Amino acid sequence: MAKKKKVQALIKLQIQAGAATPAPPVGPALGAHGVNIVEFTKAYNAATESQRGNIVPVEITVYEDRSFDFKLKTPPASKLLLKAAGLQKGSGVPHTDKVGKVTWDQCKEIAKTKEPDLNANDIEAGAAIIAGTARSMGIDVEGRPSA
């Protein structure tokens, strides 16, 4: 049986897909744990090349021998909603000022994209979670079936 490596740290970052560089925030976060930063940036950029333009969260597990593993997550729901609504940012006063609209079908598409990371039993429940995020950003959801 292979020996288990001892975990030294778990680092969570949100980095632009295919564009990780040793500059902040990547360099200082990994350098503090003695990880080879260039090796990580090359591996991350290769793994996220197909998702260029999105921000892709990553969980980096650093072991005591300074080796590492990383697990990619799905892009944040807020970023996907902004892209779907064609906006730069959400509302500063979400329940008063509405800044955009998305359809229920767009919420379902985003829920399908985020399915591995969502805590939902099916796509409809996932879409409801996404719709809640949209509301908290000042984005109206049109065509939502009533409960």
UniProtKB/Swiss-Prot annotation:
Annotated Gene Ontology cellular component terms: cytosolic large ribosomal subunit
Name the record gives this protein: Large ribosomal subunit protein uL11
Role according to the record: Forms part of the ribosomal stalk which helps the ribosome interact with GTP-bound translation factors.
Gene name per UniProt: rplK
InterPro entries membership: Ribosomal_uL11, Ribosomal_uL11_bac-typ, Ribosomal_uL11_C, Ribosomal_uL11_C_sf, Ribosomal_uL11_N, Ribosomal_uL11_N_sf
SUPFAM superfamilies (UniProt xref): Ribosomal L11/L12e N-terminal domain, Ribosomal protein L11, C-terminal domain
Gene Ontology biological process terms from the UniProt entry: translation
Family: Belongs to the universal ribosomal protein uL11 family.
Keyword list, A-Z: Methylation, Ribonucleoprotein, Ribosomal protein, RNA-binding, rRNA-binding
Subunit annotation: Part of the ribosomal stalk of the 50S ribosomal subunit. Interacts with L10 and the large rRNA to form the base of the stalk. L10 forms an elongated spine to which L12 dimers bind in a sequential fashion forming a multimeric L10(L12)X complex.
Cross-referenced NCBIfam families: L11_bact
PANTHER family in alphabetical order: 60S RIBOSOMAL PROTEIN L12 (PTHR11661), LARGE RIBOSOMAL SUBUNIT PROTEIN UL11M (PTHR11661:SF1)
Listed GO MF terms: large ribosomal subunit rRNA binding; structural constituent of ribosome
Pfam families according to UniProt: Ribosomal_L11, Ribosomal_L11_N
Presence of the UniProt keyword Ribonucleoprotein in the record: yes
Cystine crosslinks: none
Post-translational modification: One or more lysine residues are methylated.
